[in-house]
UniProtKB/Swiss-Prot annotation:
It comes from the Eukaryota. This is Ribose-phosphate pyrophosphokinase 1. The lineage of its organism: Eukaryota, Viridiplantae, Streptophyta, Embryophyta, Tracheophyta. Its EC number is 2.7.6.1. GO terms for molecular function: ATP binding; kinase activity; magnesium ion binding; ribose phosphate diphosphokinase activity. Mg(2+) binds at D150, H152, D161, D165. The gene is PRS1. GO terms for biological process: 5-phosphoribose 1-diphosphate biosynthetic process; purine nucleotide biosynthetic process; ribonucleoside monophosphate biosynthetic process. CDD domains: PRTases_typeI. Gene3D superfamilies: 3.40.50.2020. It comes from Spinacia oleracea (Spinach). It is an enzyme of class 2 (transferase).
Length: 336
């Protein structure tokens, strides 16, 4: 993808012409979790992916060997820790260790989807805070920086003792919605739970300051959600539900059913991360949604595609961020 296809919400951003986009000290390597996204990122940047050998032994152990020199290089490792989360996390840690032992100057873990991000606090007694543990593991493995996309909660950045660049996938989805022929007066942005209100409010502000509605739910267990009521008016409106991720789709599908009951004309689901644990596909393709809009931070299996699904790419966004990190330029200015 060329720079012309960069989201229009960031098109007004002045790309610093002083950025050295031909620096031979920059290396990008891909793990096995999402090689298609890594290839898109490299294509946007005009680079080739670094040569790396990753294999599994018969007993399940992971082997990583860099097949080119990274001595003194600025290395970026693209590896979301999506399902299977433990496999992909361990692979990332071994990749980081291999780069450190090969004398890379800087190692940035590019984690489009950060697994364990939901385990960011104790909700009951005697629970672990796995997000902090994973942050420690990545740091101890030898990473100098993390580049993550739409973390589940802001406090996760504070769990790392190294710099974290937080990239937002929101502009990519906003740009797509802006291309659709939906009257701004008909729009209402809906948060599927109280915890996502800040995210939905920021989204609504970008959509001509659209009104906001909130689905009030009570969760009785992991991956189980019960919708209680709706705060706000959606009658005759096009409801756009916004969340950072769709896992089993229980929350968002029950919320959509409630929106239809309350008179919504159409319901769109927008999410950066498509975890799609069963029975998500059945729920999302049941006819509740006019369209389900996601990004490719997590690869979607071919069997999980359905007619209402639209997958947008964050490759340009991540590629531009990598250039700016490498050249010590501002990252936040991309989103202003």
């Amino acid at each position: 993808m060329d720079q012309q296809s960069f989201p229009s919400f960031m098109a007004s951003t002045h790309f610093d012409s002083s950025i050295n986009r031909n620096d031979t000290r920059l290396r990008i390597f891909s793990g096995t979790a999402n090689p298609a996204l890594a290839q898109e990122i490299a294509c946007y940047m005009g680079l080739q992916l670094g040569k790396i050998k990753i294999k599994r032994f018969a007993d399940g152990e992971i082997y990583v060997q860099l097949q080119e020199s990274v001595r003194g290089c600025d290395v970026f490792l693209v590896q979301p820790t999506c399902p299977p989360a433990n496999e992909n996390l361990m692979e990332l840690l071994i990749m980081i260790d291999a780069c450190r032992r090969a004398s890379a100057k800087n190692i940035t873990a590019v984690i489009p989807y950060f697994g364990y991000a939901r385990a960011d606090r104790k909700t009951q007694g005697r629970e672990s805070i796995a997000a902090k543990l994973v942050a420690n593991l990545i740091t101890e493995a030898g990473a100098n920086r993390v580049l993550a996309c739409d973390l589940h909660s802001g406090q996760s950045m504070g769990y790392f003792d190294i710099p974290v660049d937080h990239v937002y996938g929101q502009p990519v989805i906003l740009d797509y919605l802006a291309s659709k022929t939906i009257c701004s007066d008909d729009l209402v942005v809906v948060s599927p739970d109280v915890g996502g209100v800040a995210r939905a409010r920021a989204f609504a502000k970008k959509l001509s300051d659209a009104p906001l509605a909130i689905v009030d739910k009570r969760r009785h267990g992991h991956n189980v959600a019960e919708v209680m009521n709706l705060i706000g008016d959606v009658k005759g409106k096009v409801a756009v539900m916004v969340d950072d991720m769709i896992d089993t789709a229980g929350t968002i599908s029950k919320g959509a059913a409630l929106l239809h009951q309350e008179g919504a004309r159409e319901v769109y689901a927008c999410s950066t991360h498509a975890v799609f644990s069963p029975p998500a596909i059945e729920r999302l393709s049941s006819g509740l949604f006019q369209e389900v809009i996601i990004t490719n931070t997590i690869p979607v299996l071919e069997k999980n595609y359905f007619p209402q699904l639209t997958v947008l790419s964050v490759a340009n966004l991540l590629g531009e961020t990598i250039w700016r990190v490498h050249d010590d330029c501002s990252v936040s200015s991309i989103f202003q």
